Curated annotation (Swiss-Prot):
Lineage summary: Bacteria, Pseudomonadati, Pseudomonadota, Betaproteobacteria, Burkholderiales
Binding site for (6S)-5-formyl-5,6,7,8-tetrahydrofolate: R25, E82, K135, K478
Recorded family membership: Belongs to the TRAFAC class TrmE-Era-EngA-EngB-Septin-like GTPase superfamily. TrmE GTPase family.
GO molecular function: GTP binding; GTPase activity; metal ion binding
Residues binding Mg(2+), per UniProt: S245, T266
UniProt keyword Cytoplasm, yes or no: yes
Top-rank EC class of the record's enzyme: hydrolase
Protein name from the UniProt record: tRNA modification GTPase MnmE
């Protein structure tokens, strides 16, 4: 994609389907012939002009608004034409074809097409050109896609902050501090004969400590932003008839899963996207965990464990009424033993960073003696809603959600990984500075690697294959 960014491009910029308004966007160098062919005349810069859009025979395709954004004052940094027409698919396809036709028309002065290379844009190519022409950096470009894909209001507002440059400003502030510190180290390396200890005199250790403190704040906001973007996968697990489907319905506020008194009703997963304080959670209800009674249930249990093993958090649901002292002793013993087996399997199968929350359900059906058995976890009734707010807050706590007071900006996992690498490099640099005889060449290399990681976030230094992957995930027309 990068090799062809000089070609003029065109695409439908609005979502597929019918709508009140649809937009066709053209970007490139010297697109005046396309403007003249479709609009019949030149357009005043950055002014919306209502006029007919015509085909090659002069027939009206539609009437709408045309806006010309001359370079460099446009979204892509190139000459841009936007045709805002009625949002019917046929109309927009006719306008798209007309743009391509106008570009291929012969220029009588030279006997060749006006815009021989005018073509349909690749996914994300308009935004890619904005990045290549320094209209936005890479973090802002990613934020545009994240804003489009946002599943909650909080996520959308965070993406808007990143799109406006808040995240980039934070990264560039880190870069400025880091570069200044690196210059001190490089100066000490370049002028070893000078009778001046650059590092001590310039308080290099203090500068590094302040840089690390700033980095910690940025990492906190970026980590929260990654949670908003990626969402959290929460799996409800437990024995049959523990109330897993009822809990999913209660959290979602809708009857999504079938609820019956018959154990083993849920045979396959049921999932729903919900939000808690703007944090998107992908909640999955699974088949009850027990020795399967038939082949279908066996498959359901296997799928349940597959979902559990890929979860960020597991709600281990216990039927507290089954532990009630009023039940026959052997039934209670058997139920507790089965819960204990599941608990051991969860501990063995899941990574240490997977949160497991014990959820004690059916408090409304449990005697006071049974309620006294609860130790730890969250006590709820999926039927009455008791304890659900406590469970929601506990979920946010265990997944690490803690909104920064100055607001969260949207970030991606690659950004968080890069910041962690920077943190590690600065920690190594700190140990070098504290040594009796610092290895300045190693210290300089640590700082150089940290600078490179930060530069990858904004795209100042980014491999072409990563750029291709990022922009290919955009929709065509953006």
């Amino acid at each position: 994609m990068l090799a062809r960014h000089h070609d003029p491009i065109v695409a439908i910029a609005t979502a597929p389907g019918r709508g009140a308004v649809g937009i066709v966007r053209v970007s490139g160098k010297d697109i005046a012939p396309v403007i003249a062919a479709i609009c019949g005349r030149a357009l005043a810069p950055r002014q919306a002009t209502y006029l007919p859009f015509r085909d090659a025979q002069g027939q009206v395709i539609d009437q709408g608004l045309a806006i010309h954004f001359p370079a460099p004052h446009s979204y892509t940094g190139e000459d841009v034409l936007e045709l805002q027409a009625h949002g019917g698919p046929v109309v927009l396809q006719l306008l798209l074809a007309r743009c391509l036709e106008a570009g291929a028309a012969l220029n009588p002065a030279i006997g060749q097409p006006w815009l021989a290379q005018l073509r349909v844009a690749q996914p994300g190519e308009f935004t890619e050109r904005a990045f290549l022409n320094d209209k936005i950096d890479l973090a802002q470009a990613e934020a545009i896609a994240d804003l489009i894909d946002a599943s909650t209001e909080t996520a959308a507002r965070s993406a808007a902050r990143s799109m406006s440059g808040e995240f980039s400003l934070a990264v560039n502030t880190l870069l400025e501090q880091l570069i200044h510190l690196r210059m001190l180290v490089e100066a000490t390396l370049d002028f070893p004969e000078e009778d001046i200890d650059f590092l001590q005199k310039a308080d290099a250790q203090g500068q590094l400590s302040r840089l690390q403190a700033t980095l910690t704040g940025v990492m906190q906001r970026a980590t929260q932003g990654a949670i908003l973007r990626e969402g959290i996968k929460v799996v409800i697990a437990g024995q049959p008839n523990a109330g897993k489907s009822s809990l999913l319905n209660a959290l979602a506020g809708a009857e999504l899963a079938i609820v019956t008194p018959i154990a083993g009703t849920t045979r396959d997963k049921v999932s729903e996207l919900i939000q808690i304080e703007g944090v998107p959670l992908h909640v999955v209800d699974t088949a009850g965990l027990r020795e399967a009674l038939d082949e279908v249930e066996k498959i359901g249990v296997e799928r349940a464990w597959a979902e559990i093993e890929s979860a960020d958090a597991v709600l281990f649901l216990h039927d507290l009424s089954r532990r009630d002292a009023a039940l026959p002793a052997q039934d209670t013993i058997n139920y507790i033993a089965a819960d204990d087996r599941i608990a051991r399997t969860l501990a063995n199968k899941l990574p240490e960073n997977t949160a497991i929350i014990d959820v004690w359900n059916k408090s409304d059906l449990t005697s006071p003696a049974g309620l006294q058995q609860v130790q730890g976890g969250v006590l709820i009734s999926a039927k009455t809603g008791a304890g659900l707010q406590t469970l929601r807050q506990r979920l946010l706590q265990v997944v690490g959600w803690q909104a920064a007071p100055e607001g969260v900006f949207m970030a991606r996992e690659r950004h968080v990984r890069a910041l962690h690498h920077v943190q590690d490099q600065l920690a190594t640099a700190g140990r070098q500075l504290q040594a009796a005889r610092p290895a300045l060449d190693l210290l300089a290399e640590d700082l150089r690697q940290a600078q490179r990681q930060l530069s990858e976030i904004t795209g100042e230094f980014t491999p072409d294959d990563l750029l291709g992957e990022i922009f290919s995930r955009f929709c065509i027309g953006k």
